[in-house]
Amino acid sequence: MERLATVRARLQEWERAFARLHGRRPAKGDVEAAPEETRALYREYRNLKQAVRQADDRHRVLEQSLAEAAEEAQEPSCWGPHLSRAATQNTQSMPKQSLLSSVQDYGKRLKANLKNTTQTGPTQSRKLQLQKRSLSTVPAPRPPGSKTESPCPDEADDALPRVPEPRPRLGQLQQLRSSLSRRLTSLDPGWLERCHNRVSDLLEVPGACGLDLSAEESQPQMSGKVNIADPDIQSEVSVQSPEAIAQQPAQVLSQSPKSINSKGRKRKWNEKGEDFAQDQPSSGAGPLSEGARATVHGQDPPGEPTQVNVPQPCNSSNQARTEKAKGTTHLHASPRPASLDRGNYIRLNMKNKRFVRVGANRGRLLRKQVWKQKWKKKQAAFGGSGPRATDKDTCFRCGQFGHWASQCSQPGPTLTVQEEGDRDDKQPISTLEEVAQRTGTASCHHSGEETQPAAPELQVPHCPTPMSPLYPPGPLGQVAETPAEVFQALERLGYRAFRPGQERAIMRILSGISTLLVLPTGAGKSLCYQLPALLYAQRSPCLTLVVSPLLSLMDDQVSDLPSCLKAACLHSGMTKKQRESVLKKVRAAQVHVLIVSPEALVGCGARGPGSLPQAAQLPPIAFACIDEVHCLSQWSHNFRPCYLRVCKVLREHMGVRCFLGLTATATRSTARDVAQHLGIAGEFELSGSANIPANLHLSVSMDRDSDQALVTLLQGDRFRTLDSVIIYCTRERIQNGWLALLRTCLSMVGDSRPRGCGPEAIAEAYHAGMSSQERRRVQQAFMRGHLRMVVATVAFGMGLDRPDVRAVLHLGLPPSFESYVQAIGRAGRDGKPAHCHLFMHPQGEDLWELRRHAHADSTDFLAVKRLVQRVFPPCTCSQRPVSKSSPEEVKEHSGQQTYPVLGQACLGHERALPVQSTVQALDMTEEAIETLLCYLELHPRHWLELLPWTYAQCHLHCLGGSAQLQALAHRCPPLAACQAKWPPKDTSQGRSSLEFGVVELADSMGWKLASVRQALHQLKWDPEPKKGAAQGTGVLVKFSELAFHLHSRGDLTDEEKDQICDFLYNRVQAREHKALAHLHQMSKAFRSVAFPSCGPCLEQSNEEHSNQVKTLVSYYFEEEEEEEETMTDTQGPKPGQTQLQDWEDQIRRDVRQLLSLRPEERFSGRAVARIFHGIASPCYPAQVYGLDRRFWRKYLHLDFHALMHLATEELLLRGR
């Protein structure tokens, strides 16, 4: 039988492949034309079927001989005729009476059976129990293809054990006779009449020849045996004639209700066992095709059991099968039990739920409950829509409350197994061509077809017309003189005159000219966008967008605006109600200035939390202001990549043509990069520079113990009396208990001022590991003067508007000159003297920490290549015409380089890159991957276009089964296209759930992603509800797996992909080298003017030393244009490079030890070097590898690239 199942499975696999290839089932001629191996399988299948049939015939003859031998066997009798073996006779030997005649004397035979039962007594019941136990050993019918074995003669003899002669007890015959009289009087004549009517209806059923009289559901007529639902005897008889069926109702009804109830539980167990066997079909389940049956020369198909075939006169249509199932249900009714006197007991219906609570409502609560129920019933009459049907508390069939689908009496859409299979056969899955014709989209296609039409090009949203300037510039672009209207607006804002640089910048914005303004911290940069916004709003309803980097900075900017200027902010930290209120005011043109984060601006139209709506829903935008514009050049790389797309989104989606950039620190190279983003053509003039105010006194020292030096400095005369101090250091240093040491040491120093005049607290921490409420509390306490010192990271202080900050201290080297200038610029804004000091480590530990961040953003060429392969997968669009000119090699991202324009046959496809899987595959952070994608979007060739993030996978589950899924596909084009694009592998069994890619489906259909998502969401609700309220369909639709969403071409050549890889890798390498060069240059500059210790800085500041530091910083910002020539000279020999030879042997041993301890990991040279430097990555997190201090941060003082080179050599030697 195992070989038969194997051969059947292979033949069915060949037939399915033939059907997919030719669109039809194979015929006899196709089988003869098949390969020799296939024909040999058909011949072997025929021989195996014949062998199985012969074995079944021998088994049937053996059973008949055993039955005849049992009839002829004579038993010694001394108790009368009640010991005869008539009850053990086979049902096949019963007299063949007509079904109609048996109905007429139904009651007579029932009484006769009851009388015989009385005569036989307990002996007959014992025989029946033994016979039941013996017959239970006969194998039940198994599904096709299952392994069966014919019983041997010995087992057949054991199936009929000899029954020992029982000894009757005295008085038992009289008890049985009395019980007979009671049971005869309890018979209901109406019940006999109903039985007569039911059996008469049975004669009218066209498919009655194949009925199953068991309590199970009607199964397809696969075998010629019928299971008799006898509670005491379970046997299988061959259906030979209608007369044999006429005997079965009498046997069913001849048992007492008590016996039926007592055996019901065991009967259920047997049925579960049979169902469990049937629920495990073999790989060859299912009939062969018609051509295959013709090939086997009239033999049974392999999907049917090897039983005696019964001629079925019934029709094979769905209507006949439904009538057959209805006819079967009449015979499943159990007889009515006799009325019994149960005394003080009642019957509980456990199928219906009854809720009885201890604390039931009484009195006022009960009257209120009744009042609510009454008005719920009147709700429809008063215009209400009734309770809304949900998926949790309503029936999936009828949509009513109070019951589940299993107790529903109304016919629902759910089908039986047979009807569901018939519907699957009658309703095949639509092809892609049919779906395209039905939906009107000609772009539904397979991903592997060569004739696939190109996907439609991504349409850019219509940009609104830009606003005209308030004061148009002259013919040569000159700015007009400042009119009196501008000065009047200045007075309305509370100012009397302009500060240096403000007037020129404001007039350029009012003339519609993009401007980059660089002013020191506290010089009034906010006025440069407030005044133009007010004047534009006075002329016509419009909006001014301000892009701000921090949420706390947004709140401060809104609160500091004058009352005549209406402003609001929009970010992800707001509640849904707050966002809706702000958007409502913006649409109504009640807001003059809208402050948003770059993430909210880039994700406009994505309907995410804190995202900005589309430009069509907003008033005309006068101009856009980007505060802290240096973030476009510094923060945009691997930290906040959305900054790279801010100007592109404003220009292409919002229609903005005038930009204003505000910053306090911008070198020459940073200014050129920012000007390129803002679209400032030609030479630009920096209004102001990063000049350090004269009231700041700077000093630098290199102390061996920086903690003790800080305490000594704060206890000195120079810093002892200062009330507001900001101390910048790393987060690790704050969390290592250093803050407690600072509080303890400073509390022991007495304060000469009177009680109540100074701050209440000494020092508090501020870093990203704290909650937002705690950070806000610390900042407010510092702003109100209740806190003397704030020990924080570099995130604190941006947008801080406290003019009397008296001191700023740095524990360690700052990240850059720009960061240092911004930090010290927060002190002394009131013009009074302020002090700033920098502590450096003499051994360079602070420089080592900063180098870690530069190396963390770099990646390998192999990771870049994998990303390019994921972004530009090949498509089947027709090839482009070959251009005569060859593409030039991409070297740098410069707008001056020209590229040949080639004819494009592929207009691009929408793709989704799952974030989590992409991060793990490339071992890169989300920000680093998005940065590389932004590089490709901003490239002159425009390799791709980034879209808002989306959920790529859709999981759809139908509670109604595969029939409901097929019905929904006819009214939902995306679902039909999904089934046609990804057909199920096994079509014999229906499926009720689907999981597919939404972006890929939308691209193949040519639809927008939003339309596809909306169509799938509509499947959860009934389009034609029976009531006024919306009703659920029982369909669950869930979107998951957040992914990068982009639009890219699929016809790039290998040369173009190599150019993209080189371009991205060169950009990453250039950023890393530039960051390292700046760090070394800054470290060298500060070391040249640093004191060996803080001793000279304790009492008073050194003016000469302060001027040296100021000159050094100003030189960096003014002479930045020579950076490219001096970068290699400035970098010089790398620190730690000369010590590598002394550590080489130890490094190699540690690499080998690391590889042996973790053989399951696939390390790379960069991964090993990151572990030695303490750099976490997605595949090698610090929470796991940071626990092993034998390797983590062990070689931080050595060069990163040298470690990576040694690790790569060891990996190659070990073959990994």
From Swiss-Prot:
Tell me the segments the record calls region Disordered: 72-100, 113-171, 235-340, 436-458
Spell out the subcellular localization from the entry: Cytoplasm; Nucleus
Family under the similarity heading: Belongs to the helicase family. RecQ subfamily.
DEAH box: where is this motif? Answer: 627-630
State the protein's purpose: An ATP-dependent DNA helicase which unwinds dsDNA with a 3'-overhang in a 3'-5' direction. May play a role in development of the palate and the limbs. May modulate chromosome segregation.
Q: Which SMART domains match?
A: DEXDc, HELICc, ZnF_C2HC
- The Helicase ATP-binding domain sits at 506-684
Start and end residues of each Helicase C-terminal domain: 705-872
Q: What species was this sequence derived from?
A: Mus musculus
What protein am I looking at? ATP-dependent DNA helicase Q4
Q: What is its main location?
A: cytoplasm
Task: Quote the subunit structure annotation.
Answer: Interacts with UBR1 and UBR2. Interacts with MCM10; this interaction regulates RECQL4 unwinding activity. Interacts with TOPBP1.
